[in-house]
Amino acid sequence: MTQIKIKRVYEEPADTDGYRVLVDRLWPRGMKKEYLKYDVWEKDITPSPDLRKWFHGDIAGHWKEFAAMYEKELEGSAAAVKEFLTKIASYKVVTLLYASKEPVYNHARILQQYLEIHLK
């Protein structure tokens, strides 16, 4: 079964990262494209621009509502999610890369949990 991990894009890559997936809609601030080691950039399973902007207005305060709204967006993007799950099914480890400074309140954590549920 595939193990899904999350990691900031600014952390050093490791051999244990496996298949590295950038899961931010926007390119990480200050990161040159030639320096980021990633296998694929999956914009279609990231929060919509409006949801992302709203969430960043009050990260901790909006967390629970954001999580529910993002999961609803993922359900609305079932084809993209299914395609991604098919893509990662053959990998033992997949690392979702995110740029946020916030290690707890970030969309990658929600996406990780959502994907783990739907991989089964």
Question: Where are the language model's segments positioned?
Answer:
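Residues lining hydrophobic/aromatic ligand-binding pockets adjacent to catalytic sites
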Residues: 1-120
